[in-house]
Regions:
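Structural signature of eukaryotic scaffold interfaces centered on beta-propeller domains
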Residues: 38-47, 83-99, 137-152
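Structural motif
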Residues: 8-14, 57-65, 107-114
Length: 152
């Protein structure tokens, strides 16, 4: 079973062998009205679906746990935090080894989030090409990020 978030903030599920057949559809509620869900992933340690609400104009971000049956998004932690992810593609994936979320923006920014506190765990160095690469000096175009053994 595969879960996805639609442009209308609905949580849908479908079978990978029949992707045109929607098995469930529930509206997602509880996300700050100024934020858009820009990434979701299941936390391997608990099986919970996490989502990131983000406002690209202000940089305000917040982690949520999304109930698969009701679509209710419950904020993790007490307040928003700031990220500089820009307005392009955003990569979001759990690292199952250290139980942290890797976030990368189309602008090359690179973060780790803490699923327990709901806040920023670390700001890592910007993504960049290695010295000597023909693209050195350009921002790498990252559309997704994935870890091995990241399943429930």
């Amino acid at each position: 079973l595969i879960y996805a978030v639609t442009m209308n903030n609905n949580l849908i599920s479908f079978d990978s062998e029949l992707p045109g057949v929607i098995r469930s559809l529930v509206p997602i509620s509880g996300v700050n009205a100024t934020q858009t869900l820009v990434g979701t992933d299941f936390r391997p340690n608990t099986g919970e679906l996490f989502g990131l609400g983000y406002n690209s104009a202000t940089g305000a971000a917040r982690l949520y746990i999304i109930n698969l049956q009701t679509g209710v998004a419950t904020a993790v932690g007490n307040s928003d935090f700031n990220l500089e992810l820009g307005s392009g593609a955003i990569a979001f994936d759990f690292n199952p080894t250290v139980d942290r979320i890797r976030m990368e923006g189309a602008n090359g920014k690179n973060y780790r989030l803490n699923p327990i506190t709901g806040g920023l765990a670390a700001t890592d160095g910007d993504l960049k090409y290695a010295a000597g690469d023909v693209n050195v000096g350009k921002t790498p175009a990252v559309g997704s990020v994935a870890y091995t053994n990241s399943f429930i």
